């Protein structure tokens, strides 16, 4: 990937983030493991991978299998909603989901992602969701 090569040329750390559909595969059908392994093989890989713009219940099915590829994922930036990307694109109102449910779903992924150190939010999230993800009191 060009971004990895460019960052390496100037000595910058670099991360690549993938999104997944409800089955844990990339939108083109590529399994998450295969995508990470392919980028690592082609370019030596970024310093970190993240998964973003998908609810944790959509990410979880993609975290199966063996190998060190799951250790390469350092971050999750999940959507608040459990709706599919197509449903979100067609929605006329923001689906904010449930902050506690989002946090619980992310917590279930922690044992599968031993390098997880970046947790934030993507579509539909706000300070309430991030507070729940980090287990701190939310705005009030």
Regions found by a protein language model. Name each.
Residues 1-140:
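Domain-level signal for soluble alpha/beta catalytic cores
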């Amino acid at each position: 990937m060009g971004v990895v090569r460019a960052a390496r040329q100037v000595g910058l750390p670099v991360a690549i983030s993938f999104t997944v559909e409800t089955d844990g595969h990339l939108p083109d059908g590529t399994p998450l493991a295969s995508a990470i392994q392919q980028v690592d093989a082609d370019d030596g890989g970024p310093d970190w991978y993240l998964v973003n713009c998908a609810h944790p219940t959509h990410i979880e099915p993609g975290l199966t299998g063996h190998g060190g590829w799951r250790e390469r994922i350092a971050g999750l930036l999940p959507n608040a909603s459990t709706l599919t990307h197509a449903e979100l694109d067609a929605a006329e109102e923001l689906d904010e989901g449930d902050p506690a449910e989002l946090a619980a779903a992310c917590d279930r992924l922690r044992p599968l992602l031993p390098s997880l150190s970046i947790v934030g939010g993507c579509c539909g999230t706000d300070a309430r969701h991030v507070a729940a993800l980090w287990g701190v009191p939310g705005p009030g």
